[in-house]
Each structure stands twice: as structure tokens, then as C-alpha cells.
From Swiss-Prot:
Native source species: Bacillus subtilis (strain 168)
Role of this protein: Catalyzes the oxidation of dihydrolipoamide to lipoamide.
SUPFAM superfamilies: FAD/NAD(P)-binding domain (SSF51905), FAD/NAD-linked reductases, dimerisation (C-terminal) domain (SSF55424)
Residue positions binding NAD(+): 183-187, 206, 272-275
One GO CC annotation: cytoplasm
Nucleotide-binding is among the record's keywords: no
Keyword Iron-sulfur: no
GO molecular function: dihydrolipoyl dehydrogenase (NADH) activity; flavin adenine dinucleotide binding; NAD(P)H dehydrogenase (quinone) activity
Protein family per UniProt: Belongs to the class-I pyridine nucleotide-disulfide oxidoreductase family.
The protein's name: Dihydrolipoyl dehydrogenase
Record PANTHER family: DIHYDROLIPOYL DEHYDROGENASE, DISULFIDE OXIDOREDUCTASE
Amino acid sequence: MVVGDFPIETDTLVIGAGPGGYVAAIRAAQLGQKVTVVEKATLGGVCLNVGCIPSKALINAGHRYENAKHSDDMGITAENVTVDFTKVQEWKASVVNKLTGGVAGLLKGNKVDVVKGEAYFVDSNSVRVMDENSAQTYTFKNAIIATGSRPIELPNFKYSERVLNSTGALALKEIPKKLVVIGGGYIGTELGTAYANFGTELVILEGGDEILPGFEKQMSSLVTRRLKKKGNVEIHTNAMAKGVEERPDGVTVTFEVKGEEKTVDADYVLITVGRRPNTDELGLEQVGIEMTDRGIVKTDKQCRTNVPNIYAIGDIIEGPPLAHKASYEGKIAAEAIAGEPAEIDYLGIPAVVFSEPELASVGYTEAQAKEEGLDIVAAKFPFAANGRALSLNETDGFMKLITRKEDGLVIGAQIAGASASDMISELSLAIEGGMTAEDIAMTIHAHPTLGEITMEAAEVAIGSPIHIVK
């Protein structure tokens, strides 16, 4: 401790105010804790400021532009449809600003103290918080680390004005004429699709056999087909990016496919090959917190580290880097600190891709269930047999419901189709609530809605489908 530096005491110190940190702080405050949040950048973290929210705003804008140009089959013809990309970016920023202001209001309303700066552990009960002009020591009874992650930088692709990470891609001032995306996961596919809808010529380089490798092949193949149908998208699988040559007006990317070296010229190259946990500048070694070789913090089922009063949540612990996973873990950690018997259960946590069509998955896939030796029923229902999907002109896709054969218990679901991101929540509820396929089939769903697809898939699972022939 620096001479003259009087420490400020708090019950629970939260490091990071992203979707995990600010939720943890609010829940801890609700449970009677005096809470302090330390945030080095902007409230809301990556998700709200340079991730989930702005990317979905950009995707929505691109989708609307695409629809305006291609609704001839409905009798709608629009001429001279144009994009003012400056206004698109201004609108996107307004969405973000409303939400960051909302987070600030929620923290204030719950009497959470917010401190700007970077926290560094001194010991297991104190941190040093530093900003540009000062430093202050904070002591705590418990701490929750929620510092998130950052994009991985490839050795031969150093970030610059032309070599972008996801943050840079969201901040472009112009619509690229041509964009190369390295990595066909959910981030690359979402951002690539958004720009392709604005008219950008898109080239995706994916190292695996399929884009979106975390999803079943039948699902990712639907997305691949829709992308290629646009006419301005190339997808190279089993491709290895080798290097980039930058010019003032663009880049030349070198890559290899099946031993053959190729090049492609573009305005920009976007790198989306994963994210790295932000655990390397916190002084975790000062308190002996155990981590993996990848910098992932080891935790138990209450998000507690090996140091009993220090917890970790979100992208810095095991599991997919999902905002809603971090928020869930934040609540669990706050409740554990308060002495409540809360434990994490990841089976009901969904994963979503805002592609075309959207993809969503929760619980077991058919392959995973079979690998574990489970006796299951995998029931499918197509979007093309649903009235609402037809009226929306969104007939690509299907729902697959995974149930346990012995009792019909819902243990998983996959959706490829319009509004899959909204539909998956009912299946998460089914898993969390221990519901059976019969429970869903007997639940009255409004007509005509996409939600009926869930009911229809459940009817298939119990052997009594109405709108498809057995």
C-alpha cells in the first residue's frame, strides 16, 4: 500500500462491467452486499459496445436493405434503393448509447459504486485500481473477476487499418467493395453476411470442412447454400491463411487449399479465429489463482476459484464465450457469495448464430446423445410445413427435438430457420423445467406462428404428427 493511500472498503468487488460483471454486481447488491464495479473501458463490455448489440444492428440494417431489393416474388418492386452508411453507423451507435446509458442507470439504481480504471490484485483481499491520473487501493471480502476476452491476433496478420478484428469491422466508415474473412465461425459468418447484404463481395476462408463448425452439418450447409445463392459470396473450406500484403488502398491475402497456394485482393481482411481470455494483466499470480495453459481460470460449480473468496465468470472460464452464459454465471457467483446453494448447469444454455437462416442449439445434439449411449428420439419438423413460415417467405430450415426414449424428457433441440434465436428459449425452458415432448405437444401455441413448429416437432416425437405424414 502506498503511504497516504487510505483503502476504500467494499463487500464485493467486481472487475469488469460487461454482461457478466454488471449482472453479478446488481444481483449481489440485491442480496444486501455493498458492491463496487471496476471498469477500464465502457459499461456493457464487448457485447454491448463492440459485439453482440452493434453487430445485430448492422445485420438487421443489411437484411432490410437486401429485402427491399429482393421482394419481387411478393409483387414488391423497389427501384434505386440506396444505403447511407454514415447514417447506418449513426443509428447503430444510438442503439449502443441507449443501452450503455441503461446499464449505468441500473447500477446507480441498485446503489452499485462504479470506478473507472484497471484493477491489479495486491493480495486475496485487495486490488490496486489505476487510471491515467491516479491510483487507489480497494479492499474486499469477495471478488468476482469478469474481464472478458479479446480477439486472437494471427502472427502473419497484425491488426491495422486494413487488417481488422471484429471491433474494426463494426467501425468501418464505408461499405467495402470486397472483404476477406478468415474464420468461418459465428462472428465471421455474421459480419460477413451483413456486409454481403450491403453489396460487398465476400470471401470466407475456413480451416475446417464446413463453416460454423460447432453446429450440425445439415444446419451449416443451409447457411452455406444461402450465402452462395447471393451471388457475391465465395467460401473456401480446408483453407489455411498464409499472409497478407497491405497497400494504401487494400490488401492481398495469400492462402492455401489442398496444397495449392492462391491469392485474393480485397479492401480489407477480417480476422475471426477466436478470442483470448483477459487474464494476463490482473496480477492473478499474486494470489495464486489456478489457470490452464490458455489462461482460462479454473472454477467450481459456483464459479469459485481455488482462492475461496475470489470468483470468476464469463469468457475467462471454461465454456463458449457467450454473453448470456456470463450473465447466468454472474448471478450464480453473486448468490454463492450470499450463501445460497446455487450451482451452474450448462445443459440449458443456448447457442445462437444470426446467420441466414438463423441457427440455434441447446442441450444435446443427436450425435452427442448417441456418443453418450443415450436411447433417444430425434424428431424433425420442417419450416416449409408451417403457415407462418410460408407467409414470411422463410421456408428454409427445420427444428430437431431430442428426447429421451424411455420417458420423453426433452434433453436437446436444434433449429435452423427464421427467428431461431427467439424460438430456442422455449426449448431452454423445457430442459430447465424437466418437461417432456408431451408437455410441449399439449401446450396450445398461437396460430399462425413460427412457435407452432416447436409444438409440431413435439408431436412428431410422441408419434402423433398432424401436419406431416408419418
